[in-house]
Amino acid sequence: MPEEKNTFYITTPIYYPSGKAHIGHAYTTVAGDAMARYKRLKGYDVFYLTGTDEHGQKIQAKAKERGISEQEYVDEIAEGFQELWKKLEISNTDFIRTTQDRHKTSVEKIFEQLLEQGDIYLGEYEGWYSVSDEEYFTETQLEEVYKDENGKVIGGKAPSGNEVELVKEESYFFRMSKYADRLVEYYNSHPEFILPESRKNEMINNFIKPGLEDLAVSRTTFDWGIKVPGNPKHVVYVWIDALSNYITALGYNTDNDTKFQKYWPADVQIVGKEIVRFHTIYWPIMLMALDLPLPKMVFGHGWILMKDGKMSKSKGNVVDPYMLIDRYGLDALRYYLLREVPFGSDGLFTPEDFVDRVNFDLANDLGNLLNRTVAMINKYFDGEIPAYQGNVTEFDQILVDFKNNVVKEYEGSMDHMQFSVALNQLWSLISRTNKYIDETAPWALAKDEDKRTELASVMTHLAENLRIIAVLLQPFLTRTPGEIFLQLGLQEENLKKWDSIYGYGEIPAGTTVVKKGTPIFPRLDAEVEVTYIQDEMKGSAPAPAEEVAEVEALETPQIGIEDFDKIDLRVAEVKQVDKVKKADKLLCFQLDLGEGKLRQVLSGIAEFYQPEELIGKKVIVVSNLKPVKLRGLMSEGMILSGEKDGKLSVIEASSALPNGAKVK
């Protein structure tokens, strides 16, 4: 018999299909996916649930506006959510819909049980009702009230800003107050039940201490929902209908409840902060009434906001996840969502930050590390990773110790749902590995045959760190880890598993890297892409930059010899090269053109060369180019480079040519 795995059950809220899925839905679901993938990586039997809440007055009204049935409407919207999950490569185990028979049958049984127990009773309700929120409010809860000339309240706005109307109807009620003390006791004995901690204080102080009122759990003002057993003029309201999905999806109250017995209670339920109250008051009280164990944790995350507040079409600030994936790749979006915003807090989406994350974190830090490593293994060892030897250079053990510490910190952060912290720790390992290249200077070691052992050690440490980085990236990015494994020539599945990160030097000697690595994240033109995203948010994006560039390439004009003669090409010797602060593409050259003084030229090749590699080379310079200022530095010329597959290579002149020789 195979050893039984530890289980892990994680859920997102079921989304209300009143419109197109947006980046907020993507954020919650990608976060859940990262946690599910992390636990699978560690060997857990994971059940990841998401879905749609498909009943209610608002949906009934939307379907009527469209002239279609409610079922046709929710089928269409639910399909849109499932398409987005596929696009995001969400690894959910199941997708529950509240219109499915498996859900409806179980909900009917739950309602009957609570009614028979006396936890639900029939009464009458009068209050201020918001159709948009599908919730009743007392007069004191209203954000704004409207009064007539006699001072009588005649309307108002809910805390959400939506209009309310006075509604009186017969309703079934749930005796919430019966369980209030027991719930607070549970909070106190289970400190991790509500996270972050601030959410728990909010629930106690704002909702429980003032006194829990009995909760209306049925409606008669609309009929698109699950009929109350024995009283079909009532439909079961969202508090029982939607919240119970977390157990109905597992087969609760059915003849086949194997999954329920195996996975319940949930380990983590991820929800947006606006619905924490429903999941930490209504939901646990319902479970107490059913005599079922409560979830181990409800994590209320913040919102992704824009500079001008929440996303809305009227503000022209809606971010379409499909657009970001199609233009920049899935991993760029997944990385940004989980790195930019501390999970549990609100965060801002800006096009500038998104492009910077792609360029600096993904293309520069991670992409360049892979490119340089593969290129050096090809150059110095004919593409074969040498046998591992530990502690050869003075920096080797420092790097290994740093890795061990990062793994420990990363694991702690992931266990506490701190995704941005875990990614920050992982990027510190990427930065430390890049620093290791600068410290060991493999291009210098390669010039000394006596340093061959040290050079081999550097290559194995770089490859091994990249392997471990790829393993740790697997919860977050779905495609990049596989590309790193591919470029490093790693085929053994054991090298991609979680347990492999605790050791070191696991890559077999002679493993062959790819001959020519391709950039896993091409750099973006920041100005062009920021403008593109802004225009897309407003609904008026220009043609993609790639298409424009392709047309321009086909229409390059021909020139006469008289035009070419205007260009003064000279041989120059590189005397000094420095990186330019806050400009990761630029290098600042001091060149000898035989003029009796050095000339300063800036070139955008920093991602392809270390400064030390270029000193002493003879290069070709356009010497009569009009001087320009870049990043506050004057550039007096242009160094010629060739381009292939997105990589630039400096065109070198013969060492026999004197400095300043004219190139014809």
Swiss-Prot record:
Q: Ranges for the tRNA-binding domain?
A: 563-664
Q: Where does ATP bind?
A: K313
Q: Name one GO molecular function term.
A: ATP binding
| Intervals of motif 'HIGH' region | 15-25
Kindly state which keywords UniProt assigns to this record, in alphabetical order.
Aminoacyl-tRNA synthetase, ATP-binding, Cytoplasm, Ligase, Nucleotide-binding, Protein biosynthesis, RNA-binding, tRNA-binding
InterPro entries for this protein = Anticodon_Met, Met-tRNA-synth_bsu_C, Met-tRNA_synth, Met-tRNA_synth_2, Methionyl/Leucyl_tRNA_Synth, MetRS_core, NA-bd_OB-fold, Rossmann-like_a/b/a_fold
- Motif 'KMSKS' region at which residues? 310-314
The EC code for this enzyme is 6.1.1.10
Catalysed transformations (reactions): tRNA(Met) + L-methionine + ATP = L-methionyl-tRNA(Met) + AMP + diphosphate
What GO terms fall under cellular component here? cytoplasm
**Top EC category:** ligase
Q: Is Cytoplasm set as a keyword in this record?
A: yes
Provide the protein's localization. Answer: Cytoplasm
Query: Can you tell which superkingdom this protein's organism belongs to?
Result: Bacteria
Quick check: keyword Amino-acid biosynthesis in the entry?
no
What SUPFAM superfamilies has UniProt attached to this entry? Answer: Anticodon-binding domain of a subclass of class I aminoacyl-tRNA synthetases, Nucleic acid-binding proteins, Nucleotidylyl transferase
Q: What's the main place this protein lives?
A: cytoplasm
* A GO biological-process term: methionyl-tRNA aminoacylation
Q: Which HAMAP family match?
A: Met_tRNA_synth_type2
Membership in a protein family: Belongs to the class-I aminoacyl-tRNA synthetase family. MetG type 2B subfamily.
What is the role of this chain?
Is required not only for elongation of protein synthesis but also for the initiation of all mRNA translation through initiator tRNA(fMet) aminoacylation.
On assembly, the entry states: Homodimer.
List the protein's name: Methionine--tRNA ligase
Species the sequence originates in: Listeria monocytogenes serovar 1/2a (strain ATCC BAA-679 / EGD-e)
The top of its lineage is: Bacteria, Bacillati, Bacillota, Bacilli, Bacillales
